[in-house]
Amino acid sequence: MPPFYIERGEQMRTLLLFDQVQAGFGGKERGDTELGLEKGGVGSYLMFKEDFETAGLTALATIYCGPDYFQAHKEEVIHKIKNLILKTKAEVLFAGPCFNYGTYAQMAAEIALAIQEQTDCKPYVICSKENEETIAAYKDKVVMLEMPKKGGVGLREALGGAVAIISGKKDESEQRFQ
């Protein structure tokens, strides 16, 4: 069921959810980075920007948060993200690429589940199979798509595939954790 966004000249409204590393605001040592927001796509978005544009997705904003900060302020972070989704009328929450960063994948899955339960926005978590515990806990609750670990082969294809799934051009079963 393709959404035909490009044919109608519309764009699918998307918010990106990154940790501080993927947003470009520091390394693992900055896990306490507070919830922040940048207009448009920043950081790792540049890896799949072309795929987004080709598929008719538009990055409204990049939400970023350190996993340690999230764990200490879950309710506040989820509440603010939910309100942003409602305000922007975002249709998709793109949480990733999480690679094999366990704390980021856990944060992404928890936020994705809350957003799925509290809004009409469709969340997608993109992470590597090394996040076994998070995948086992959330794969039947939210859409979790597979990608290689950091430094792994096939990153470009995995991110392009995730975008194709979101835009309706590819079936999610081809990349979803089973």
Predicted regions located by residue number:
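An N-terminal assembly and electron-transfer interface module characteristic of large anaerobic redox
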Residues: 2-178
